[in-house]
Amino acid sequence: MRFSMLIGFNLLTALSSFCAAISANNSDNVEHEQEVAEAVAPPSINIEVKYDVVGKESENHDSFLEFYAEDTATLAYNVTNWEDTNITIFGVNGTIVTYPHGYPVADITGASIGPYEMEVNGTSKFGQDVTLNLPEGQYFLIPFLLASRFDEIVRIAAPPTLFEIVSPPISFFNPQFLSVQVIFLAIIGGVSYYYMKSKTNQRPSKKSATVKKVDESWLPETYKK
């Protein structure tokens, strides 16, 4: 009996040691993963980025801003520096992804701006034009600002904007619409012509009236021809 208890105690001790070793190993792995993540993560920066799409202001951020293909969206930025040191904004770029799946479909062409030297708690305002060369559909617009702090370059993401590319309204003078009108009028004219022609062919011809000779025997001589 004592021998069985001794074996059980030894097994429990071994299992406890094994679990402790696994726990310590997992803890080391978690710490290592955190260190790697911190090493590869982009540097954080305390910058507040707001912007409006000029001419498309909307109070509801969940609604889609409508554009036509090849339209240009003008972004008016308002950036505030909440860092405890000065920073410099020197560029803008970004990406466009599909909604709701988030597949990248276009890059916003990078452009140099400023540079804008922003003091602590300072604010800068500037603009950016984005040409929407996209097919019809729904998208996310995600702009990025490029800034420098000390000797490091940071990429600052701005809030995404929902927008939609819609088909343009058809103008009365649109060549495609005019061609449809011409074809429609030609069809009406052709049908009318053949209808009138068939009616004319079906109309019975009038027989020439025969001239009857009048009996003049009863007339006085003065009235006879």
Curated annotation (Swiss-Prot):
UniProt keywords, alphabetically: Endoplasmic reticulum, Membrane, Signal, Transmembrane, Transmembrane helix
Leader sequence segment: 1-24
Stretches assigned to the Lumenal side: 25-169
Highest taxon in the source lineage: Eukaryota
Keyword Secreted part of the UniProt annotation: no
Membrane topology, Cytoplasmic segments: 191-225
Region spans: Disordered: 203-225
Record has Amino-acid biosynthesis as a keyword: no
Listed transmembrane segments: 170-190
Annotated knockout phenotype: Displays increased levels of spontaneous RAD52 foci in proliferating diploid cells.
Cell compartment(s), UniProt: Endoplasmic reticulum membrane
Membrane disposition: Single-pass type I membrane protein
A single cellular component GO annotation: endoplasmic reticulum membrane
Pfam (any one): TRAP_alpha
Main subcellular localisation: endoplasmic reticulum
UniProt biased composition (Basic and acidic residues): 212-225
InterPro entries, sorted: TRAP_alpha (IPR005595)
Miscellaneous section: Present with 7110 molecules/cell in log phase SD medium.
Its job: Is probably involved in a pathway contributing to genomic integrity.
Family statement drawn from the similarity comment of this UniProt entry: Belongs to the IRC22 family.
Name of the featured protein: Increased recombination centers protein 22
Organism: Saccharomyces cerevisiae (strain ATCC 204508 / S288c)
Gene: IRC22
